[in-house]
Amino acid sequence: MRLVLVGPPGSGKGTQAERLVARFGLTAIGTGAMFRDAIDRGTDMGKTVGPLIKQGLLVPDPIVNEVVAELFRGPGRPERFVMDGYPRTYAQAVAFDALLRLEYLRLDAVVNLSIADEEVVRRISGRRCCANPVCGVCFHVVARPPKVPGQCNACGGPLVLRDDDKEETIRRRLGEFHKNTDALLDHYRRQGLVRDVDATRSLDQIFADILTGLGNPPAFVPTATEGRAS
């Protein structure tokens, strides 16, 4: 199974990606996590994309496309995967289509998680993440508060409001998202791949709707070889 998750920030793509990974044995691929790691490590890429992400702007297509292409060209390329945060633009979708053709792979579905902007702002602005780069666990001041205010349950590190979780940044990111998403979804609708899902429902209901949209495929059962490899 090969999937793309589309949705604004705060729509729950990461959470649903985790559930899809657990059920179907997929590899989760998130460009946002890749870039945050590069920023934390102070790499050349991190220095390039850091200011853009801080302002709520999209990373240029050529940079994102190359990061993803390197992953798929490598010896351990993913065969079954769920993409979280890529492609985000029509140009990225075209580049990804070309990359998959070169690798003799094809997408099975594009899951579109829809949610109102104000709900996105409410969700993200309440998020607090562990400042420890080794940990990075995130909480929510209302929906998932830590046991001790301002302190990570996992490692005890301080919880902070990340720059890209501030309201002004969120609204800029939403503007960028809406500007690019119509053409992206039209591209995939023409291929018959889009499955629309209401992301305002409960996490369990959203996941059930995703499974329905995918035709309720059976859960993945690893072979003995795959079990030993893991």
Could you say what each language-model-derived stretch is?
Residues M1-S230:
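Glycine-rich phosphate-binding loop of ATP-dependent small-molecule kinases
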